[in-house]
């Protein structure tokens, strides 16, 4: 829990103050910490999944049990850590000025979907890590790059208008960005009130937002991804990744622990 908080502090100094990414985002501290905590859950699940089979090679060789229990157990440990971190996140969100509303209940299905996605991703990483010793050393580098494409420290909606629409869609629909956005929509009223599409489309006001970064005017822009699309994407990523992970991991069930 301390590492995500320290990362949040560094990102706030670099992106919030130095690069002024806090412009156009109400309650940037809550926005940033939410993104860091949610992404860290997926990041740790994937990184741990890539090392779990080799780290437990002696146990695998000594006992007969479903090998999938190992990566899944580690994801559950990370999920417990996330729940503990929520005890820190909630006060931060409230202190910054966000109200406690019934929308917070949506956090439950969001976290369940993310945990499901993480399980599938961990199973895939577990098989890849078991087959290639150096693979697990590459994963932290890749997840670090992934972090910068998920809108953790900035708003994807406020990216320059010159950026192609397809590129914004790719950023918005990547799984980590989807679960981060759903979480922010659940616990941050300002994200629902001032997100693109919250108000009827107004080209002039939207254009002013793109140059002046005025949060209220952001609501008058066309949404990159609607709330319904976010939920469909979140469900889709969770189901597809879990099924793919189970099948991919199970195909090598008898080979784990050899060599």
Regions found by a protein language model. Give the residues of each.
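Hydrophobic transmembrane alpha-helices and immediately adjacent juxtamembrane helices
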Residues: 1-259
């Amino acid at each position: 829990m301390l590492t995500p908080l320290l990362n949040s502090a560094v990102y706030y100094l670099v992106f919030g103050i130095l690069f002024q990414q806090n412009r156009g985002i109400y309650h940037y501290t809550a926005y940033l910490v939410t993104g860091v905590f949610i992404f860290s859950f997926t990041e740790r699940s994937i990184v741990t999944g890539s090392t779990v089979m080799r780290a437990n090679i002696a146990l695998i060789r000594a006992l007969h049990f479903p090998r999938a229990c190992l990566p899944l157990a580690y994801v559950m440990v990370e999920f417990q850590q996330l729940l503990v971190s929520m005890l820190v996140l909630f006060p931060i969100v409230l202190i910054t000025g966000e109200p406690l509303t019934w929308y917070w209940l949506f956090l439950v299905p969001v976290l369940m979907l993310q945990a499901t996605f993480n399980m599938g991703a961990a199973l895939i990483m577990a098989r890849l890590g078991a087959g290639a010793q150096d693979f697990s050393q590459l994963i932290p580098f890749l997840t670090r790059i992934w972090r910068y494409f998920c809108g953790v420290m900035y708003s994807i909606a406020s990216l320059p208008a010159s950026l192609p629409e397809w590129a914004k869609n790719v950023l918005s629909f990547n799984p980590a960005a989807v679960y981060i956005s759903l979480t922010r929509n659940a616990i941050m009223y300002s994200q629902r009130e001032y997100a693109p599409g919250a108000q009827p489309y107004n080209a002039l006001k939207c254009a002013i937002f793109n140059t002046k970064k005025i949060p209220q005017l952001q609501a008058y822009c066309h949404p990159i991804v609607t709330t319904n699309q976010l939920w469909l994407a979140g469900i889709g990523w969770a189901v597809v990744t879990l099924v793919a992970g189970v099948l991919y991991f199970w195909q090598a069930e008898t080979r784990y622990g050899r060599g």
